[in-house]
Swiss-Prot record:
Biological process, per Gene Ontology: carbon fixation; oxaloacetate metabolic process; tricarboxylic acid cycle
Swiss-Prot/TrEMBL cofactor(s): Mg(2+)
Secretion signal span: none
Catalytic machinery residues: 140, 545
Family listed: Belongs to the PEPCase type 1 family.
Enzyme class label: lyase
Protein name (database record): Phosphoenolpyruvate carboxylase
Catalytic activity: oxaloacetate + phosphate = phosphoenolpyruvate + hydrogencarbonate
Gene name tied to this protein: ppc
Alphabetically ordered keywords of this record: Carbon dioxide fixation, Lyase, Magnesium
GO cellular component: cytosol
Highest taxon of the lineage: Bacteria
Described purpose of this protein according to its UniProt entry: Forms oxaloacetate, a four-carbon dicarboxylic acid source for the tricarboxylic acid cycle.
Length: 878
C-alpha cells in the first residue's frame, strides 16, 4: 500500500520536533515527557492495546488543573502544523521523474477529449473564454483559526518551500531551520482563541486579505495557464478581457439572522472593498511604471499623452493619479458622507482602457514579450476584480420583508399583508410595481426593524450597480417573496434590474421550486424586470438539516431538473447558485466531482457557488493551492457544459425515490420524533458551549426552540466534535439496507458505476464514515450523558456501524477508503493527536458544566482550544 510520502513525513516530524523544543523551553522536560506519554498511549490504544488505553487515561486523569490548557494547546498546535505540511506537500517542487499534479493537467486533458468528441477548436476557445464562474466568499464563519496565526502559518509554509532545494549550503539550511524554530515559537506563544467575536467588517477584511495575499496572484497565473493550454490545443488565445472566473462575497451583506449586519455596515464594506481595489492596483501600476520605460509607442497612445519621452509612463501616471484620488475619496467617505471627488474612477472601462492601450501599443511596436508580462497580469485582474474587488450580495429572510410590508399596508389602512393569501399579495405587489407614485408618504415613521430593511434597500440604491451581486431571499417559497423585494428596492430608488434571487432551502420549498418559478415567469411585467438571466439559489445546509443528506440531495437534483425545464420552456437563461457548506452534512465535498454530478443542462456555461468559512483558507489561502482549485473549477464547468452526464435511467429515478422516502422516515424518526433526542444532543455534544465560542459575527440560533431553531453550522459542528458525524449519514444506513433486502443490490451497484450523481454521494458518504468514530462518541456519552439517555446513544452508534457495513458491501471493500490509502493513513496518523483532545474535551465539558463563577475561565479556554484542535485535525468544522 502506498504510504504517506517520505518528504511529507519528514516535514511533519521536523515541525513536531520544533514544537517539542518550544514546549520544553517553556514548561521543562518533564511536561514534554507527559505529552509524549499521552501521544504514545493514544497510538497504542488505537492499535488495540489495553495497556496503552490504560496509560492514556491514567496520564490524562493525573493532569493538574493548570496543565489542561497547555496539553490541549500542544495537540492542537501539532495538528495545525501537520495541516501546514500537508498543504505545502500538494504544491511542493516536483522531482524530475515525478508526474505533475492532476489539477495542473486537467484542462489540457479535457480539451483533448472534447476535440476527440467532435468539438471544433474555435468553439472550445469561445466556450472557455465565455464561462461565467462566480465563487461567493462567505464568513458563516467556522474559520476557527485567527488571522494572526494564519499569517504565521503562511510564513512557515514559505520556509518549508525554501528548505526544499537540494543545493542549499549548510549555512543556508541552518538559517532556514532557525527561522522555522522562531515561527513555530511565535505560533505557540500566540493565543489561538479570539477573545471577542469578529464584527461583520472584520470578516469582510479577512475575505479581502485572502484576495490580497493569494487570489490577486493566483488569478492571472491561472488565466496565463488557460491561455497557454488554449494555444496548444486550439491555436487560439484567451481574449484580453475574458473573465471566466469572478469573485463575490456575503461578508458584510448577509444579514439573515445576523442583526450585526446593518445598512451602515454594508455601506462601509462596499467602500472598504473599493479602497482595497484601488490600493492593489496602485501597487501594480507602480511596478508597471518602473518596467515600461520604452520610448516607441503607437499613434493612438501618443495622441493621449502628447510629446513625451516615456509615453507609457506618462499614461500610467494619469491612471495612477486617478487611483490615488479614488483611494483618498473612499478613505474620507468611510468617515462620513462625502460626494465623489473629480477624477474618482466610477466605471471599469476607465481602468481597463489605458492598460489595454499600453498593451496594444507594445504589440504594435514589436514588444509583445513585454506586453504579455506584468501588464497582461494587471489587465486580467482589472477584467476580473474590477474597481470593486468583489460583488457584494445582500441576503435577508423572506419573513423580514413580509413584516415590513405588513407594517406599511397597515399604516396605509389597506389591511395586513401578513394575513393576505398569495393571490391578494400578488395583485397588490404587481399594482404597486407598475404604479408611478411612491408607496410611502414622505413623513412615514417606520419601526426599527422596517427602517433597517428600507435602509438596506437605500444603501443598494446609493451603491454603483457593478459593486453589487444579487439580493438573495432566504426561506423563499412563493412568487410574492421575489416581488416583495423588487417593490422595496423600487420604493428605495433602485432604478436598475438587480438580480432578486429566491433561495429554496427546506424540503417542501425545494419540491415547490419548479411551480413557484413557473408562476413567477408568467406574471405580467416580471420578465421585463429580469437582467438577462433568472438566478435561483439551491440551499444545501438547511435542506440537509430538515430531511437528512440523502433525501435533500435528491430533492436538490429534482428541483434543478425542473428549473432547467421551466426556464427552457420560457426561453429564459437560468443561473443556478449553489449554497454549499464545507462539510458533507451541508452539501460540501470535492467541487470537481460535485459539478460533474449536476443534472444535465443545469450548468450550461454558468456556475455560482458559495465558498465557506475554513474551506476558503484550505482551498484559496496559498496562491499555488488557489491555482489548483481554480483550474478544477474551470475544467469541471467546461466539461459539465459540453459533456454533461446522461439523464438518469427510469429505474435509477424510481430507486432514488424509494431511497429518499426511506431515508426521510429514518432521519426524522430520530431527529424529530424521538422525545429524548434534543436533550441527548445538548448533553452528548458541546453544542451549548459552541454558542459561546467567539467564532463569527452571527448568533448560533435563529430563535428559541429545538433542533429546527439551530443554524446548520453549529448543528454540524457539534456532531463533528464528538466524531459521530450524525447529520452526514443518518438515513443512508436504513435506506440502503432496505434496498439490499429488497434484492436491489445489483441496481445500486449499477447506479454507483454509471451515474455520477450517485457515485459522488457514495464517495462523500464513505469519506465521512472514515472520519466518524463510534468509540470516541461512546467516550462522550460515558462522561456526559445520564444513564437514562445512554440507550439512545447506543442506538445511534449501532446505526453508524450499520452505515459502515452497508457502504463496504456496496463498494466491495473490506476497509473504508481502501482505494485511497494515503487519505486513510492521513486520518489514522491524525487520530494519535485527536484522541487525547477528544478525551480532554469530554473531561473539560463535564467539569465546566459543574463549574460556577470565576473559576470557570481557565476551563472554558482549554475547552475552546480542544474544539479548535478537533476542527484542525478533521480539516473541517461546520
Amino acid at each position: 500500500m502506498p504510504e504517506i510520502d517520505a518528504r511529507l513525513r519528514e516535514d511533519v516530524h521536523q515541525l513536531g520536533e520544533l514544537l517539542g523544543d518550544t514546549i520544553r523551553e517553556q514548561y521543562g522536560p518533564r511536561f514534554l515527557d507527559k505529552i509524549e506519554l499521552i501521544r504514545k498511549g493514544a497510538k497504542a490504544a488505537r492499535r488495540g492495546s489495553a495497556e496503552g488505553a490504560q496509560q492514556l487515561t491514567a496520564t490524562l486523569d493525573g493532569l493538574e488543573e493548570d496543565e489542561l490548557l497547555p496539553v490541549a494547546r500542544a495537540f492542537n498546535q501539532f495538528l495545525n502544523l501537520a495541516n501546514i505540511a500537508e498543504q505545502y506537500h500538494r504544491i511542493r517542487r516536483r522531482r524530475p521523474n515525478e508526474p505533475e499534479p492532476f489539477e495542473n493537467l486537467v484542462l489540457e486533458e479535457l480539451l483533448g477529449r472534447l476535440k476527440d468528441a467532435g468539438h471544433a477548436p474555435g468553439q472550445l476557445a469561445r466556450q472557455l473564454a465565455g464561462l461565467e464562474i462566480e465563487l461567493v466568499l462567505t464568513a458563516h464563519p467556522t474559520e476557527v483559526a485567527r488571522r494572526t496565526l494564519i499569517q504565521k502559518y503562511d510564513a512557515i509554509t514559505a520556509q518549508l518551500a525554501a528548505k526544499d532545494h537540494a543545493d542549499l549550503l549548510p549555512e543556508e539550511r541552518s538559517r532556514i531551520q532557525q527561522r522555522l524554530q522562531r515561527l513555530v515559537a511565535e505560533a505557540w506563544h500566540t493565543d489561538e482563541i479570539r477573545k471577542v467575536r469578529p464584527t461583520p467588517v472584520d470578516e469582510a477584511k479577512w475575505g479581502f486579505a485572502v484576495i490580497e495575499h493569494s487570489l490577486w496572484q493566483a488569478l492571472p497565473n491561472v488565466l496565463r495557464h488557460v491561455d497557454e493550454v488554449l494555444l496548444r490545443s486550439t491555436g487560439e488565445r484567451l481574449p484580453l478581457t475574458a473573465a471566466p472566473l469572478r469573485f463575490a462575497s456575503w461578508m458584510g451583506g448577509d444579514r439573515d439572522g445576523n442583526p450585526n449586519v446593518t445598512a451602515s455596515v454594508t455601506r462601509e464594506v462596499l467602500l472598504l472593498a473599493r479602497w482595497m481595489a484601488a490600493d492593489l492596483y496602485l501597487r501594480d501600476i507602480d511596478r508597471l511604471a518602473a518596467e515600461l520605460s520604452m520610448q516607441q509607442a503607437s499613434p493612438q497612445l501618443l495622441a493621449r499623452v502628447g510629446d513625451s519621452a516615456e509615453p507609457y509612463r506618462a499614461l500610467l501616471k494619469q491612471l495612477r493619479e486617478r487611483l490615488r484620488v479614488t483611494r483618498n475619496w473612499t478613505h474620507q467617505a468611510l468617515a462620513g458622507e462625502v460626494p465623489a471627488a473629480e477624477g474618482v474612477l466610477e466605471h471599469n472601462r476607465d481602468l481597463v482602457e489605458p492598460l489595454q492601450l499600453c498593451h496594444e501599443s507594445l504589440h504594435a511596436c514589436g514588444m509583445g514579450v513585454i506586453a504579455d508580462g506584468a501588464l497582461l497580469d494587471c489587465l486580467r485582474r482589472a477584467a476580473t476584480f474590477g474597481l470593486f474587488l468583489v460583488r457584494l450580495d445582500v441576503r435577508q429572510d423572506s419573513a423580514r420583508h413580509a413584516a415590513a410590508l405588513s407594517e406599511i399596508t397597515e399604516y396605509l389602512e389597506l389591511g395586513s399583508y401578513d394575513e393576505w393569501d398569495e393571490k391578494t399579495r400578488l395583485e397588490f405587489l404587481l399594482e404597486e410595481l407598475n404604479s408611478r407614485r411612491p408607496l410611502l408618504p414622505a413623513h412615514y415613521q417606520p419601526s426599527a426593524d422596517t427602517a433597517e430593511v428600507l435602509a438596506t434597500c437605500r444603501a443598494i440604491a446609493a451603491a454603483p450597480p457593478a459593486s453589487l451581486g444579487s439580493y438573495v431571499i432566504s426561506m423563499a417559497g412563493q412568487p410574492s417573496d421575489v416581488l416583495a423585494v423588487q417593490l422595496l428596492l423600487k420604493e428605495s430608488g433602485v432604478d436598475w434590474p438587480m438580480r432578486v434571487v429566491p433561495l429554496f432551502e427546506t424540503l417542501d420549498d425545494l419540491d415547490n421550486a419548479g411551480p413557484c418559478m413557473e408562476r413567477l415567469l408568467t406574471l405580467p411585467g416580471y420578465r421585463s424586470r429580469l437582467s438577462g438571466v433568472q438566478e435561483v439559489m439551491i440551499g444545501y445546509s438547511d435542506s440537509a438539516k430538515d430531511a437528512g443528506t440523502l433525501t435533500a440531495a435528491w430533492a436538490q437534483y429534482r428541483a434543478q431538473e425542473k428549473l432547467v425545464e421551466i426556464c427552457r420552456q420560457h426561453e429564459v437563461e437560468l443561473l443556478l447558485f449553489h449554497g454549499r457548506g464545507g462539510t458533507v452534512g451541508r452539501g460540501g465535498g470535492p467541487a470537481h466531482a460535485a459539478i460533474l454530478s449536476q443534472p444535465p443542462g443545469s450548468v450550461a456555461g454558468r456556475f455560482r457557488v458559495t465558498e465557506q468559512g475554513e474551506m476558503i483558507r484550505f482551498k484559496f489561502g496559498l496562491p499555488d493551492i488557489a491555482e489548483q482549485n481554480l483550474n478544477l473549477y474551470l475544467a469541471a464547468v467546461l466539461e459539465a457544459t459540453l459533456m454533461p452526464p446522461p439523464a438518469p435511467e427510469p429505474a435509477w429515478r424510481a430507486q432514488m425515490d424509494r431511497l429518499a422516502k426511506d431515508a426521510l422516515l429514518a432521519y426524522r424518526r430520530v431527529v424529530r420524533d424521538d422525545p429524548q433526542f434534543v436533550e441527548y444532543f445538548r448533553l452528548a455534544t458541546p453544542e451549548q458551549e459552541l454558542g459561546r465560542l467567539p467564532l463569527g459575527s452571527r448568533p448560533a440560533k435563529r430563535r428559541e426552540g429545538g433542533v429546527e431553531s439551530l443554524r446548520a453550522i453549529p448543528w454540524i459542528f457539534a456532531w463533528t466534535q464528538t466524531r459521530l458525524m450524525l447529520p452526514a449519514w443518518l438515513g443512508w444506513e436504513t435506506a440502503l439496507l432496505n434496498a439490499i433486502e429488497r434484492g436491489e443490490g445489483a441496481l445500486l451497484g449499477q447506479m454507483r458505476e454509471q451515474w455520477p450523481f450517485f457515485t459522488t454521494r457514495i464517495d462523500m458518504l464513505e469519506m465521512v464514515l472514515a472520519k466518524a468514530d463510534a468509540d470516541i462518541a461512546r467516550l462522550y456519552d460515558e462522561r456526559l450523558v445520564p444513564l437514562e439517555l445512554r440507550p439512545l446513544g447506543r442506538r445511534l452508534r449501532d446505526l453508524l456501524s450499520q452505515a459502515v457495513r452497508v457502504v463496504l458491501g456496496l463498494t466491495g471493500q473490506s476497509l473504508l477508503l481502501a482505494h485511497a490509502s494515503e487519505t486513510r493513513e492521513s486520518i489514522s496518523v491524525r487520530n494519535s493527536y485527536l484522541d487525547p483532545l477528544h478525551l480532554l474535551q469530554a473531561e473539560l465539558l463535564a467539569r465546566s458544566r459543574r463549574c460556577r463563577g470565576d473559576a470557570c475561565g481557565g476551563l472554558e479556554q482549554a475547552l475552546l482550544v480542544t474544539v479548535a484542535g478537533v476542527a484542525a485535525g478533521l480539516r473541517n468544522t461546520g
